[in-house]
């Protein structure tokens, strides 16, 4: 992905999370919000991104309880990936972890991931325009 497109995706991600007005605000009631901080082997960034794109597309399409999956990399550090995740409930999060597409992603990327940190998050306000 070229630098301009990566910058646009990062800008869209942070605009949506931090600056978008509450046109359709989500409440956190019952929802699970997580942030994943991932470091990828720099020599395997492109295969990792391909596997991640497939997993996100399939999860959003196939799992009604997967509400939001945003993946970005840190500018000038494509091996540093952050994923913002919102699930309808703890049960749908657990279902996602057992889904065929997530298991496929984990198996495919196992040797690519140098470190993984998961954080439970408490939304202040999640706003997005339709």
Question: Where are each of the predicted segments found?
Answer:
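Glycine-rich beta-strand-turn "strand-cap" elements at beta-sheet edges
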Residues: 2, 8, 15-32, 70-77, ...
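An amphipathic, aromatic/His-enriched active-site/gating alpha helix that lines ligand/cofactor pockets
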Residues: 27, 54, 58-67, 86-120
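N-terminal targeting signals for Sec/Tat export/insertion, comprising classic cleavable signal peptides
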Residues: 32-62
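Acidic/polar helix N-cap motif
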Residues: 41-44, 77, 89
